Regions:
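Aromatic-Pro/Gly-enriched surface loop or interdomain linker
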Residues: 1-30
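Stable alpha-helical elements in mature extracytoplasmic
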Residues: 2, 26, 49-52, 75, ...
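Catalytic beta-strand/loop cores that center a nucleophilic Ser/Cys/Thr
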Residues: 7, 91-174
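Residue-level recognition of beta-strand->loop/alpha-helix junctions
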Residues: 15-17, 67, 182
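Alpha-helical scaffolding within the catalytic cores
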Residues: 16-23, 48-51, 162-168
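Solvent-exposed loop/turn segments at secondary-structure junctions
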Residues: 20-22, 38-43, 63, 69-74, ...
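Short alpha-beta junction capping motif
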Residues: 27-74, 175
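C-terminal alpha-helix
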Residues: 201-208
Length: 208
C-alpha cells in the first residue's frame, strides 16, 4: 500500500526487504530512505549498515521513519539520535488496535499543509523513548486512559494512562532532514487519506 500511494503521487520508489541495500550501492543517487519495518533483534542493522545510513542522512539526504521502524534497538541506542525517539521493547505499550482521532496540533508546521484532524484505525503508541531536544511535534492524539486485558493467558490487566501523545515530528540529523510518524501499523491504516497526506508531506519536506 505504501509503495502504491507514493508512486501514484509521482515518486520513484525502489522497495527492498533486506538491509544490504544500505551498503550495496542502492542508495547512490537516491533522495531519501524510508523505513517501514522493525530493526531490532535478528533484524538489527550491522555496524557497516548503521554507518552507511548515518552518512547518507547526515550528508544531506532525507529519512522517513514509519511506526515500528522507530523502535530503538538495545544494541544501537544512537538510532534515537537520528529519529528523536520511538518504541522501546518491553517498555512501550498501546491500547488495543482501534479507531481514534488524530489531531494536527500545529497547523503552521512545514509538514501540516492540507492536513486536518482525521480518524484512523491504528495503534496509539505510549511510553516511547522521546527526545524533546530537536523534535518539532505537529501531530498528536488524546486518550482518556483505560484498563485492558493482555492477549495471552495468565497475563494481568494493564492500565494505560490518559494524556496527549505525539504521533509525528520532524528533526534534523547533520545536514539531513528526518520525518517520523508513529502511525501506520498495517495496510488498513496506510489506506487512511490522512495518513497518506501526512507521509507525502513528510517526503516532500525531507527531499525539498
Amino acid at each position: 500500500v505504501l509503495k502504491e500511494f507514493l508512486e501514484s503521487e509521482g515518486h520513484n520508489v525502489e522497495m527492498r526487504e533486506d538491509s544490504r541495500a544500505l551498503t550495496d550501492g542502492t542508495l547512490r543517487g537516491k533522495d531519501a530512505l524510508v523505513f517501514n519495518t522493525l530493526r531490532e533483534g535478528e533484524m538489527v542493522l550491522s555496524a557497516d549498515e548503521q554507518e552507511s545510513m548515518k552518512t547518507f542522512i547526515s550528508d544531506g539526504k532525507g529519512f522517513i521513519c514509519i511506526h515500528i521502524s522507530g523502535c530503538v534497538p538495545d544494541s544501537w541506542s544512537e538510532y534515537a539520535d537520528i529519529t528523536g525517539g520511538g518504541w522501546v521493547m518491553g517498555e512501550s505499550f498501546h491500547p488495543p488496535y482501534g479507531k481514534f482521532q488524530v489531531d494536527i496540533q500545529d497547523s503552521n508546521h512545514i509538514c501540516a499543509g492540507g492536513l486536518e484532524s482525521f480518524e484512523t484505525e491504528d495503534e496509539l503508541y505510549m511510553n516511547i523513548e522521546y527526545r524533546d531536544q530537536g523534535n518539532d511535534v505537529f501531530v498528536s492524539a488524546d486518550f482518556d486512559g483505560g484498563t485492558f486485558g493482555k492477549n495471552r493467558e495468565g497475563a494481568e490487566d494493564m492500565h494505560m494512562p490518559g494524556g496527549t501523545f505525539p504521533l509525528a515530528w520532524t528533526r534534523n540529523y547533520g545536514n539531513g532532514k528526518v520525518f517520523v510518524t508513529l502511525l501506520g501499523h498495517d495496510g488498513k491504516s496506510h489506506q487512511s487519506a490522512g495518513f497518506q497526506k501526512l507521509v507525502l508531506n513528510g517526503i516532500d519536506w525531507v527531499t525539498g
